[in-house]
Amino acid sequence: MSDESASGSDPDLDPDVELEDEEEEEEEEEVAVEEHDRDDEEGLLDDTSLEGMCGTEHAQLGEDGQRPPRCTSTTSSQSEPSEQLRHQGKILASEDPKKKRAQKPSHMRRNIRKLLREDQLEPVTKAAQQEELERRKRLEQQRKEYAAPIPTVPLEFLPEEIVLRASDGPQLPPRVLAQEVICLDSSSGSEDEKSSRDEVIELSSGEEDTLHIVDSSESVSEEDEEEEKGGTHVNDALNQHDALGRVLVNLNHPPEEENVFLAPQLARAVKPHQIGGIRFLYDNLVESLERFKTSSGFGCILAHSMGLGKTLQVISFIDVLFRHTPAKTVLAIVPVNTLQNWLAEFNMWLPAPEALPADSKPEEVQPRFFKVHILNDEHKTVASRAKVTADWVSEGGVLLMGYEMYRLLTLKKSLATSRPKKTKKRSHPVIIDLDEEDRQQEFRREFEKALCRPGPDVVICDEGHRIKNCQASTSQALKNIRSRRRVVLTGYPLQNNLIEYWCMVDFVRPDFLGTRQEFSNMFERPILNGQCIDSTPQDVRLMRYRSHVLHSLLEGFVQRRGHTVLKIHLPAKEENVILVRLSQIQRDLYTQFMDRFRDCGTSGWLGLNPLKAFCVCCKIWNHPDVLYEALQKENLANEQDLDVEELGSAGTSARCPPHGTKVKGEDSALPSSMGEATNSKFLQGVGFNPFQERGNNIVTYEWAKELLTNYQTGVLENSPKMVLLFHLIEESVKLGDKILVFSQSLSTLALIEEFLGKRDMPCLPGAEGQGTQKWVRNVSYFRLDGSTPAFERERLINQFNDPSNLTTWLFLLSTRAGCLGVNLIGANRVVVFDASWNPCHDAQAVCRVYRYGQKKPCHIYRLVADYTLEKKIYDRQISKQGMSDRVVDDLNPMLNFTRKEVENLLHFVEKEPAPQTSLDIKGIKESVLQLACLKYPHLITKEPFEHESLLLNRKDHKLTKAEKKAAKKSYEEDKRTSVPYTRPSYAQYYPASDQSLTSIPAFSQRNWQPTLKGDEKPVASVRPVQSTPIPMMPRHVPLSGGVSSASSTNTSMNFPINYLQRAGVLVQKVVTTTDIVIPGLNSSTDVQARINAGESIHIIRGTKGTYIRTSDGRIFAVRATGKPKAPEDGRMAASGSQGPSLASTSNGRHSASSPKAPDPEGLARPVSPDSPEIISELQQYADVAAARESRQSSPSISAALPGPPGQLMDNSTIPGTALGTEPCLGGHCLNSSLLVTGQPSGGRHPVLDLRGHKRKLATPSVTQESIRRRSRKGHLPAPVQPYEHGYPVSGGFAMPPVSLNHNLTTPFTSQAGENSLFMGSNPSYYQLSNLLADARLVFPVTTDPLVPAGPVSSSSTATSVTASNPSFMLNPSVPGMLPSYSLPFSQPLLSEPRMFAPFPSPGLPSNLSRGVSVYPGYMSPHAGYPAGGLLRSQVPPFDSHEVAEVGFSSNDDEDKDDDVIEVTGK
C-alpha cells in the first residue's frame, strides 16, 4: 500500500478521517477519468496517451455523495455531433454502423474528429480568453506609458503573441505606414531570416482577414523571443535590484500608486529568477492596487523546477499582498508532509514581532504583521479544527492545511467526528445525539463559508500537479472556491498526459482552454500524433505547430523556469542509467509469469490492470526474496506494497500501515485508477458473478510455488540490481559522500535493511586504522517512509543534513514519501532503485539533492531491469518527459521511440543476449560507475548512458518566426472552419478489468495446463438507440432457509460459460468499439447506464432471446422494436409493471410488512367488455395475427406495443438485429392479465377486467376464493410426463417445450380441471386451463432434472410446493397465486413471459387466426435464474430503485434496425 506521504494522507487526522481517505480512494477508483486521472486517459494500452494508464483518482472524479456528471472520455468512440457543447445533457449515438471503419492498432496514428467552429465554442471560453487578452493589453499599455528605469520585459510586447478576433475585441481600423511590409506568404521563414524588417500580427474580422502591421521599431529579436518563451518576467537581466538594493514589485505602475518594495531581509535573499516570479504573481493576482479593489482577479501557475525557491517567492508575495492591498485571508493548501516546512519558512523569512530581538532595526528586518495558522496532526477533532478556522477568518492571515484536510472539511459527506464501526449485528439500538448533529451542521456551514463560499481572498496550491483529475473529489472541492485569485505551484506541470495539464490550467483559469473535448481536438490529439519516430511528416509538423500555439496561449499566466537557472549557481549534475540483467531465478520467475499471462488471452494483459502485473514483476526484478516473502506470508495486501500514488487513486490513497502490520483483506484490492479504460467499479472476470467481494480481488502467487520450492533466501547475488546497489553504496561512502536510495516498494526497503544488517560498513576516509562497524538503523543509516511521523521526519532530515554528522551516510526513502518537500542537500549521490510509473516521482526524488545549498557535484544512478516491463516503463518516462519539454518548455526533444515501442507494454524476450565480458568505459567519467562496469560487466547489458541524452533539445527543429505565425494562423483557421475529418472509432479496443488473478486458473492452480483455443472472435460493435431504465435484478438465495451469505450468493451465479455452451446457448465475448448509452427516465431513480468503449462484454444467445452481460454483472436483454405508440394520456405506458400488489421496499431491502392499501385515485377502473376500445383492439389483434400466419416464414421478433392500461398490445414483425437476435416475444409487454376473449361464453362473467395486473379487486370474487382454497389444499395434476428436448436453465432442470403445450388450442373457458395455481386475481375465464399440464414440472420440488418430483398426498402439499417454487417462476401478473404473499418482481427479467400468451381459442371471434409461434409461450420470464424458495426469509434483498419501463412500437417501414436494450440491473 502506498505510504502516507505518497497518498498525502493526513497524519493530523484521526482514524475516522483515515476511513474517509479510504472512501476517497475507493471512489476515485470508480472514476473515469476519464479519468484520470486524470489518470482516466491513461489506460494500459491507451492509444490516446503516451502514459497509457487513468481514474480516477482516478480519481478521478466526483466522489461526494452528489456525484457530478463524468467527463466524456476523449478517447471514447461515441459519435459526437460537432454542435455538442459543454452543458448538453445527453450524448446521442448517431453514427451509422455501416459507416464504421476497421479498427486500427493502438500504436498507429489517429485521425482527429471534427473541430468545433469558432462560433460553436462555449461563451465562457470566449469570455475567459477575452479577459486574459484585455489584461495583457492593459499591462502592455502601462509599460508603454509608465516606463520604469529598469524594465522587466522588452518595452514592446511581442506582436505575434496577440491574436485578436473581431468577436473577441474591438476592431482596429487597418492602417498602413510608410515603413511597413505586408508578408502574404508564410510558407517559408527565409524572408524573416534575411530581413529584420517587421513583425506581422494577424487579425481575423469574421468573414475576411485583415492584416494589421506593426512598425519595425516594435519588432523583437530572436534572442528576446527566446527569453520570452517561458512567460513574462523571465529575462533575468531585467530582474535585478535597484541602486539601493531594493526590489520593486509593481513595475510600470501609474503615478498615483505607491511603489511596492519587498521587505529588506527578503530583498537581500531573492535571486533574479525569484524576482521575476514575484512580479509575475503580482501582475496576475493584483495587476494594480486600484483594480484589486474592483475586480475579481486572475489565477496563474508558477511552474518553476524543483529547487528554485517557489516557497520563498510565495512568502514574499503574501507579505506584499497584506501590506498594500485590502486582502485579509490567504489559504495555502500543501502536501501534508510539507506543512512544517512551510511554517518554518514563514518564521525564517518573516519572523513574528515577538521573535525579533529588541535591538533589531526596521531597515534590516521587517516582521510580519499577520498571523500564520496551521491545521496539522495536533487538531484531531472537528471542534478544534473549527476553532482554528474561525480564528483565521476573524484575525486574518495565512492558513496552512493539507489537501486531504481541505477535502474533508469542505465536502459535506466527509465531515463527521466519529463513525461507528460496522458490526455484523447490533445488540442495542443506535442512539443519535440531536444536539451533536446540530453542532455538526453548524461546523459544516462555518467551514463552507470560510473555505469555499466566499472563501479566502487568495488560494495557493503547492505541488498543484495533484489537481490532475477533473473528477477527483479533491479537485472538485478546490473548484468550489469562489475566489478567482488562485495560484498553483508546481515543478512538474505536465506529468503523464496533456489532459492532466488541461485540468490544472482549468483550475486557475476556468474555461480558458475550452471544454475537455475541445482541448483534446485542438491540442492533445495533434500533439500525441506527432510524438514518435514513426509519425508522418504532416503529424510532426502539426505537432510542432500546436505545441507552440498551446505554449503561447498560456505564457501570460504560466511562468516556466527550468534547471538551466540552477546550473549557473550549483555544481554539476550527472544522471546515468544502468540497464541491469536478470539473474537466472529472476528470469525463470519472469518467464513463468509472462507465460501465464499470455495463455490467459484477453483476460491477461488486455483485461487486467497492468499495475497488478507491475507489482508482481517489481518483486521479481528487485529481488526474489520479496516475492518469496509474499508467497510465504500469503499477504492479502501484497499488491498495495508498491508506494505508488496511482495504486490508490489519482488524488489520495489510504495511509500505509506501519511496517509489519497486517492489512485487512477488504482493503487489499489493487485499484485501477491509472486512467482505466472503463469506468466500472469492479469489473468482473469471465465468471458470471456480479456479486464478487472486493476482498477476493487480490494477486496470488500459486504460479511461483514450484519455482520457489527449494529457494534459498538471503542471497544477495540473486538480484544483480541489489549487487550493484551495494557496490554504489560502499564506494560512495569510501569517497566520503552521503547517498540516498529511493524505492517505491516498502518490502524492498525492508530487504535492503536486512542485507545492511549482515554487512560491514566500508572504511571511511581517514579512518582506515579503526575497526569495522556494522550498519545500524538511526545511527549509520536512516529510513523514511509514509509511516514516519511528521516530527520524526524533520528530525531525521535535519540530522542527516548536519555537516558535523559523520556517522550517518545512507538514507533509505520510499519514492513517494521522500520526493516532496524534503531537502536532503547533505547527500550528493542518489540511487533510484526502481522506475516509477509517473516520471514526476523519480525526477522529484533526484531534486532532493540538486537544489540551492548543494556544495558537491551530484551523481544520480537509475537502475533499470533490461528486457522487462520496467524498461518499457522507463521508455514511457522519456516520452512523457519529451512531451512536457515540448509543451511546457517549448523545446524540441528528439524522437527516440516508435509509438508501438512506447505503448506496447507486453515486453517479453525469450532469450537475453549473452553476457558481456567487458564494457566500453571510455565515455564514463565518474569513478564509482567506472569501477562498477569493470567489476560487474556480466550484470550490465550495455554501457551506462546519461538520462539527459534522450532529452536533448534539437535547436535545429525550432520553429522560425514564419512557422510560428503559420502555426497560429492554422490554429485560428481550424477554429473558424469545420474541418471535414472522418470520425472513426478512437476506442482503446482493450477490455479493462479489475478482476482478481484468483479467478484465472493460470494463477490459482499450481499444475495448470493451458488449453488449446480457437481463433478469437472479431470485435463486434453493439450500438443501442433506445432503451428502458434499469430495473431491479433480484439476487437469488439457495433453497436452504435463512439469510443467504455472500459466498452462497456468489456461487449461485458463478456458473462457467462452457456450461451454457453445452446447454445450447451461444456465448460470445466481444469488445465494444463505441459507448453504449442507456438513458434512464425522469420517473426512475436510475441515472444513465453506460457500457463504455473498450469494455469486454458477453453476448448470450439462446432460445429465449439475446442478452448482453457486462463485466460488472449487468444484464441487458436485446429487443427489436421501434418508435413508441403515442398513448392517449401523452405518456409512455409502463407495461407489465406491478402496482400495489408488490411488497413494499425500503432502502433496497425487501420489507416483511404487508402491502399498503392501494390508492383509489391511482387505480385503473374496469372497462366494459362491450366497450368500443376493447372491440377495436380485438380486431387489431385479429388482423395482425392473421397476417402473421399468412407470411409462412421463419419466426420473427415480436415487438410489444404498449398502450393505456387495459388496451391490448399490437404485434409487429421487425427484422433481427445485427446481433443475431433469436425470435422472442416482447417480454414485459404481454402478461396474463392482457389475455382476452371475445364475448364471454355463457355470460358467466359479465364484467371483463383487463386491468387485473394493476391491482387486486376491492372485493374478492367467488373465483378468487375458490382459487385460494384450492391453493391451500394443494391440488396437483397428473404425474410428470417423460422429457423431450428442453429449455436450458441454470436452476438445475430443463423445460420441455412440447409435452407441456399439447393442449394449447383448448378453449379458454374455465373447466372443472382448471389449474388453480395459475388463476391469479382475474376471473377464471382468463386462465388457460391446460396450458401447463404438469404443475410439478413448472414448480418442481427438486431442482435435479433427472429426478422427477414424487407425488405428495399430505395436507402440506401446498406448503411443499410453495416452498420449492423457484422465485424466477413467479409471474408478476399472477398475484393471486398466493394471496398472502406479495411478489418482489416488478417486471420480467428475461426476454418474454411464456407462462400465458394470447393463443387462438374458440372463445375469440371467428375471424381470429390460430397461428402460433414455433415456441408458444408457457414459461415464466424468470426462467434463467437458479431456483429459490418462495419463503419470505429466502427472498433476497433488492435495490430501492423505482421500477419504470418504456415500451416501444414501430411500423414496419420505420426504424426497422433500431435496437432496444432492455436492462435488468442489480
Curated annotation (Swiss-Prot):
Low complexity composition-biased segments: 72-82
Regulation (activators, inhibitors): Enzyme activity is enhanced by dsDNA (double-stranded DNA) and ssDNA (single-stranded DNA).
Enzyme class label: hydrolase
Reported consequences of knocking out the gene: Death by 11.5 dpc. At 9.5 dpc and 10.5 dpc, almost all major tissues are proportionally smaller, and the neural tube is shrunk in some embryos. Dramatically reduced cell proliferation and increased apoptosis are observed in 9.5 dpc and 10.5 dpc embryos. Embryonic fibroblasts stop to grow after 2 or 3 passages and exhibit increased apoptosis and decreased DNA synthesis compared with wild-type.
Posttranslational mods: Sumoylated.
GO CC annotation: nuclear speck; nucleus
Annotated region (Disordered), positions in chain: 1-137, 185-235, 649-670, 1026-1045, 1120-1170, 1184-1212, 1259-1281, 1444-1466
One Pfam family per UniProt: SNF2-rel_dom
PANTHER family in the record: HELICASE ARIP4, RAD54-LIKE
Free-text domain note: Leu-Xaa-Xaa-Leu-Leu (LXXLL) motifs are known to be important for the association with nuclear receptors.
Full protein name: Helicase ARIP4
Source organism of this protein record: Mus musculus (Mouse)
Lineage per the UniProt record: Eukaryota, Metazoa, Chordata, Craniata, Vertebrata
